[in-house]
Amino acid sequence: GDDFGRYTKLEKVTWFDDTNVHKYKNWGKDEFAVKQSFSKNRDAYDDIIAQAASMHGLDKGLVKAIIHTESGFNPRARSGPGAKGLMQLMPATARRFAVTDVYDPAQNIGGGTKYLRFLLKRFNNDLELALAGYNAGEGNVDKYKGIPPFAETQDYVRRVMSRYNKLYGGNTSRLSMN
């Protein structure tokens, strides 16, 4: 109700609606917005992010932008459709990439970065298609031969790219084809 609306505007939370495809609505006024209680986590996972990004030939800033958008740095985040943890892994994706504890930051980030590397290879290093696949599933990117016409996915790609470029030193030349 009204209290929730006031809370979300005051706290600048990212809300994940209960739909089959995540809806990303940032109630904050800027790209840096994160729920206040999790803003302390913004740099808490930097070592894990750097290690996983390096292992999979990714830019750590990109991984951080995805975590920012997916979970707002909340390691216990859970979406309505069932995605969990910092990189919001769905159960099937977690199993596919050998993640046994989605709430363990190292496992979650490790699985999420493996998945992102897989998507980048699959979509010929096209970052926007890889992000769309991360959000809506690679099958939807194949089906629509590009970013799916889902407002949620289009917003997700835009938001991650914006955060990557504005907040986390985005540099697509750091994405290798490893």
Ranges and model annotations:
Residues 1-15:
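N-terminal propeptides/low-complexity segments immediately following signal peptides
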Residues 9, 21-22, 26-178:
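Catalytic glycan-binding domains that act on GlcNAc-containing polysaccharides
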